[in-house]
Design a protein with these regions (language model features):
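Residue-level signal for threonine
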Residues: 9
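Residues that recognize and position ribonucleotide moieties
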Residues: 5-6, 45
Length: 93
């Protein structure tokens, strides 16, 4: 019963690749779980979903681990969730 199509930006794909290369299977499973959840529940469930404020207004985040967040936006008109980042804390370098 998927409602949304999940699309990863190039940055999110690179971040996901870095997580895979780290060898941390728990993080890999968590990211995979988040991507599946986003198809149905982009605003609730695991990872403490949070609407972001200020310059990131319109984006949401989910906690991957203490250091990393999955950042995404939801477009209800075209039923799409765009994941823009999966590494770092709100675009910190």
């Amino acid at each position: 019963m998927e409602k949304f199509i999940v699309v990863l930006t190039e940055k999110a794909k690179q971040d996901n690749s870095l997580h895979k290369r780290s060898g941390n299977k728990a993080i890999e499973r968590k990211i995979k779980s988040f991507l599946e959840e986003l198809k149905v529940h982009p605003f609730s469930r695991t990872g403490q979903p949070e609407a972001l404020k200020y310059e990131l207004h319109g984006f949401w985040s989910r906690r991957i681990n203490q250091k990393d967040r999955m950042i995404y936006s939801v477009n209800n008109e075209i039923v799409t969730v765009e994941v823009v980042s999966a590494m770092g804390h709100y675009f910190d370098k």
